[in-house]
């Protein structure tokens, strides 16, 4: 829980700068893009050099947040920062809320039909208020297994977790990124990958 709180604070801190931009939407996009690039680079580099540990990730994030805030305040005139109140885009806000609730209920409060791998074609079961915290689809299980392998081995996700054999991973960037976020926030990917999935899919929507 402590790792989660610290991680969320450090992830949210750079977004405070969005309130300083005259065009706050553009500022938010800039900051969000910076965070994606930074965490992806941090994941790949630390895993490549075998130093993919929580202490390293935490230290890098603390340093990055400090440098970003210091650099932004130093160059505030160049970027025309403004302390005007943030105007909420209610349409985007409502869409985000609906998206989160819709995706959340699939895993944590699902009512409807479902089938399983060993069921016959068009054979369905009924569920009411069902809670299933694990990944649903094969690609999600695939991502979880490789990301956990990266965390456990402190290296790039290039080994088959079933037999420890090397293979070319075409989704190495995504799996490295997921592993870094999970390590940074102290998440158990087996039971909490769905939370990351909800967040990512909400952004895509």
Where are these regions (language model features)?
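Internal/C-terminal transmembrane anchor helices
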Residues: 83-107
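Active-site lumenal/periplasmic loops and adjacent helix-entry segments of GT-C-fold
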Residues: 98-205
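Membrane-embedded, hydrophobic transmembrane alpha-helices
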Residues: 1-87
């Amino acid at each position: 829980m402590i790792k989660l709180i610290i991680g969320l604070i450090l992830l949210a801190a750079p977004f405070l700068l969005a309130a300083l931009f005259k065009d706050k939407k553009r500022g938010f996009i800039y900051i969000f893009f910076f965070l994606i690039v930074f965490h992806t680079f941090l994941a790949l580099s630390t895993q490549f050099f075998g130093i993919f540990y929580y202490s390293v990730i935490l230290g890098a994030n603390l340093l990055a947040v400090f440098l970003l805030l210091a650099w932004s305040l130093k160059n505030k005139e160049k970027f025309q920062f403004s302390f005007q109140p943030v105007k909420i885009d209610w349409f985007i806000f409502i869409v985000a809320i609906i998206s989160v609730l819709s995706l959340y209920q699939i895993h944590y409060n699902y009512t409807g039909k479902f089938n399983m791998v060993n069921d016959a074609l068009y054979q369905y079961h009924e569920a009411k208020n069902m809670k299933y915290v694990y990944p649903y689809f094969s690609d999600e299980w695939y991502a979880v297994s490789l990301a956990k392998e990266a965390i456990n081995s402190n290296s790039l996700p290039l080994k088959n977790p079933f037999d420890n054999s090397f293979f070319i991973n075409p989704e190495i960037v995504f799996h490295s990124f997921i592993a870094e976020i999970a390590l940074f926030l102290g998440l158990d990917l087996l039971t909490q990958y769905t939370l990351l999935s909800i967040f990512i899919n909400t952004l895509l929507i």
